Amino acid sequence: MAVSYPFSSKISHFVPPKQWASMRIARDLEKETGTKIIHFEKGDYQGPDFYTPDHVLAATIQALKDGYVRYDPGPGLPELREAIAAETSKFGRKTKPEEVIVTAGAKHALTMSLLTFLEEGDEVIFPNPGYPPDEVWAKYVRANIKHVPLTKPDWQFDLEKLESMITPKTKLLIINTPQRPNGHLVENPEAIAEMCFRHPNLMVISDEIFSHVTFDKPHKTIAAVPGMEDRTIVIDTFSKTYAMTGWRIGWAVAPVPVIDKLSIFLQDSITNVAAFIQKAAYAAMSGPQDWTVEKTALLKKKRDRMVAGLNSVPGVKCDSPDGAFYAFADITGTGYTSQEYTDKLVESAGVAVVAGTAFGSQGEGYIRVTYACSDEDIDEGVSRMKEANLVK
């Protein structure tokens, strides 16, 4: 007899992210045909060029031997909170350890922040294009989601449009710099802050997971604008800076009253982030930074290689992102929609990318391409794209 499971209606908000579809199709095609797929769709580091630094691995092993396998204080190990506070202060947001909470990745920090502030009927504004998985928990509590379109080609906020969307019910504004999926920095945090000051009930969640992966311009945080330290939750992670994506450790910086609420949430949900992983993160942040400097320089070279290659593909145009490890290429010259181009590319050329519409309606006409892979894969992928000549 079939079982009828009494699922909550809210679980319907949890669906696989659209970018996962590209990965699944590519993986299935690779398995069924034996064809080597060039994986430009993965939002992760690939290959031996990007592996967690050796001293971080060594610190993890030592932490296990030293007995860091028990519960720890929920907000995080004191030494790690101190290190994060010092690092955050370098960007101009003077931070005390008690303003830091260690989380199971940036997504966890964002989830807790959304659930701490939002309830049914509240409004939250997300950028478009953006990162739709971040919206799930707002939907879960039945908050009203608004999308502010970013202006092309540099993907910035139209402040007049943004402010027109704010009502007395608007609690949160989500910003992301460098941005997913296009890699551009938010260039005017001071102007955004000025707008926020006109709306005293508005809080900002600033997703800054690529804060240390910028190339030509320095990273800036809205939390460094005087007065915004009390209005902003800054979210960051060890994933991108130290190639620790699978370790699931990040943090949030916020005023102490907010950290206190997040700490209760964390302790009642996951209890704490694994102590030995926190020791690894401390080793990453407090140890030599040569790896990060070298890998950021390497990513810049790969960015330039990828952008030059994409601009040689028929019907494709691509500008240089300021940071992150994605390029957001304009494929309107091909005559195809984003999804059509994505599907045809993996089927005919064995190159997997993500349709821009996976990140919102403003992504139509674009594809996201990851360049955190080998030079050989970049060259081979671009060569296949050129040979496929996907132009109507």
What are these regions (language model features)?
Residues 225-261:
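Active-site PLP attachment segment
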Residues 12-105, 112, 285-287, 391-392:
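N-terminal small-domain helix-loop-helix segment of the aminotransferase-like
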Residues 116-138:
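Conserved PLP-anchoring active-site segment centered on the Schiff-base-forming lysine
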Residues 152-217:
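Active-site phosphate-binding strand-loop segment of PLP-dependent enzymes
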Residues 122, 143, 198-203, 230:
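A short helix->loop->beta-strand "cap" motif at the edges of active sites that frequently abuts
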Residues 282, 298-307, 318-331:
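Conserved glycine-rich beta-strand-loop-beta hairpin in the small C-terminal domain of fold type I
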Residues 262-266, 285-307:
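Structural signature of PLP-dependent enzymes
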